[in-house]
Swiss-Prot record:
UniProt GO BP: protein import into peroxisome membrane; protein targeting to peroxisome
Pfam families: Peroxin-3 (PF04882)
Record's GO cellular component terms: cytosol; nucleus; peroxisomal membrane
Organism: Schizosaccharomyces pombe (strain 972 / ATCC 24843) (Fission yeast)
GO molecular function, one term: protein-membrane adaptor activity
Upper taxonomic lineage: Eukaryota, Fungi, Dikarya, Ascomycota, Taphrinomycotina
Protein's UniProt name: Uncharacterized protein C29A4.14c
């Protein structure tokens, strides 16, 4: 009975179309499917109570995803600081005040500090965007399955899609998201370094720049990074799952969800969402720049401000403000809505 129902369910799911998330009221259109199963689903989705449950489930998943993203970033920020340290360069600069160091050496150290500050700042923005995207994707995939099971129970309370004691725990899945992000960090930093180098190699710290040029330069960094960086799940997935705490029994269910997460996280749509997130974060970051006079200002002074921003972004109030700017990116919710409505087990 259960297998037969799942067969019909997948037939209907593959023909799911015309998903609309407007005014927080999602509508699922099903067509060309088995009449009995189709009618059962339509009857379920047409009731006001069911729509309310759908919206509530979706909104809960997104809220939990945002919270998980902040927690994940809080852990990853220590890795960013460790892998892109600014303190040694700052200490060297302090020591030059007490020693006879040539002006050329001091300029070299200042330029190195400014370059590393840019790299750390844009790495931080990229990790913020990825945490928001991947954590929300992870919980949306799990939330969709939970809602799907709820629909099945509405259709036939005696059936269930998943065995009791499933290992699809949100804490485990967000832990996997952290492992994936941490494993990708070195590659991400390399691509940020490339983007910063290509963008700023033609300008000198002594150049006079205005706000429009600064905006163009930072936007260019985002574009170069997005064009060269591609999120992926490398290595043996069994090794990845082996890092899960032993109190959880890893089953095929969780492995399948990891494959789903990989599929959604590596699609072109996800890259577009990532780019729009970075654009929003970059725009928010620019609000911290000092007032620039009409005649312009030395780039070196702006880069000094970037150094301060790269330090402040790790503080709680600044983190919250950056994450709030991500919640304004409508493409994130649109993509999560598509994922949440993809009732397809194939």
């Amino acid at each position: 009975m259960l297998k037969s129902f799942e067969k019909h369910l997948n037939a209907v799911s593959r023909k799911c179309c015309n998903f609309i998330l407007g005014s927080s009221i999602p509508v699922l259109g099903f067509y060309c499917a088995d009449t009995c199963i189709r009618n059962a689903f339509m009857e379920f989705m047409e009731t006001r109570n069911s729509k309310s449950k759908y919206v509530e489930a979706f909104n809960t998943v997104q809220s939990n995803g945002a919270t998980s993203a902040i927690s994940t970033f809080h852990i990853l920020k220590d890795e960013i600081i460790r892998r892109i340290p600014l303190l040694p360069i700052i200490q060297e600069l302090r020591e030059t005040r007490m020693s006879e160091v040539s002006a050329e050496e001091k300029i070299l150290l200042w330029n190195q500090l400014k370059f590393m500050s840019l790299v750390r700042m844009f790495t931080t923005l990229a990790v913020l965007a990825q945490c928001n995207l991947l954590c929300k994707l992870a919980l949306t995939v799990l939330g969709r399955e939970a809602f799907k099971e709820q629909m099945v129970k509405e259709f036939d309370p005696s059936n269930t899609l998943r065995p009791s004691g499933s290992d699809e725990d949100p804490a485990v899945f967000t832990g996997i998201a952290y492992i994936l992000l941490n494993n990708q960090l070195d590659e991400l930093i390399q691509q940020v370094q490339l983007a910063v180098t290509l963008t700023f190699e033609e300008v000198s710290p002594t150049d006079i720049v205005d706000r429009k040029l600064i905006e163009a330069l930072t936007t260019r960094v985002v574009e170069v990074f997005v064009n060269n960086y591609q999120f992926s799940i490398d290595g043996n997935k069994e090794v990845l799952l082996a890092e899960i705490p032993k109190q959880y029994i890893v089953t095929g269910n969780l492995l399948y969800r990891v494959l789903e997460l990989e599929d959604f996280a590596t699609q072109m749509d996800a890259s577009i969402v990532m780019k729009n997130e970075l654009i929003a974060l970059n725009e928010h970051m620019l609000t911290y720049l000092p007032s620039i006079p009409q005649e312009g200002i030395r780039l070196a002074k702006i880069l000094t401000t970037f150094t301060k921003i790269s330090e402040n972004v790790f503080e709680a109030p600044f983190q919250e403000q950056f994450f709030q700017s991500l919640q304004m990116v409508s493409d994130v919710n649109r993509y999560m809505a598509i994922v949440f409505s993809s009732f397809d087990d194939c």
